[in-house]
Amino acid sequence: MRLQPGAKWQARVLLPGSWRGASSVLLSNGDHHLIVDTGMPHEAHLLEKAILDAGLHPEDIRGIINTHFHVDHVLNNSLFPSSAIYASQQSHDWCMSLYSDLADDQNWERLVLKYYPETHDYDRARTHMEKLRKIALRWWDAMRLGSPSQFRWIEKQSLPEGLEALITCGHVPGHLSVIVCNSEQPAFVAGDALLSKDRDADILTMIPVNRKQFEADRENILSRAGRILPGHGCDFALSAPPTFP
C-alpha cells in the first residue's frame, strides 16, 4: 500500500481498552484506513458504530493489523472480508495450537505449561489459566479470523508505509506493536505488550510467556515520547521518557 507524499497517519481509538476488553484503534491517513485489533464478537456492533462515527463504513477499511491472536483481539476480523490482515505467523500458529489444547478436557492443565512455562511463578496462576480456558471454550472460532488469503505475514511483508512493526514477544511469541512513524505526533499502538499505563498487575488477565521479556517490552514502550495506546487501558502522552527505579 503506497501513500501520497506527505500523507500522515492519525490514530483514533474505536474501542477503549479495559480489563474486560482490548482496545481497537483506527489508523487513517485520509485515503487509507486500517484497524489495529478488532475485539470480541459481542463488541461487533460497538466496533461498527465507532467506524460510522468516524465517518467511515466497514468496507472503507483496507487493512487489519493483529497484534496477536488472543480471542479479545481478533474475533471481529471477519467483519472485513476485503481487508488485508497483517500479523505474525508465529503468533497465529502458537495461538491456534494453544486453543486446540485448551479444548482437551483431560489434559489441558498439563498441556498449557508448554505454552506458559512460567505459570507456577504467579500466585494466581490457576485462576488465570481457568479464566483463559473458560473464555477460549466460549468464544474461540477460527472462522472469525478471516480467510487465509487475507493474511500478510510480517515475517515476509512490511506494514504499509509510515507504519512499523516492532516485535514485543514477552506477552506471547510473535506479538507485535505498531509504531506510527510519520504522524503529526508519534504514536505507539502497544497491544498487550503494555496493558495499561501504571496498573498492569490489576488488569493482568493473561500470564506473560516470558516475564523478563514482558517487562523489557514495557520499559521499551514507556521510554518513547509521543502518544501511547495500551492494549487494555486509556491512551496517554509522554513528553519525555520516565525514570525507572
Show which residues each predicted segment covers.
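Divalent metal-coordination and catalytic microenvironments
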Residues: 27, 37, 61, 68, ...
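Metallo-beta-lactamase
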Residues: 42, 90-167, 209-226, ...
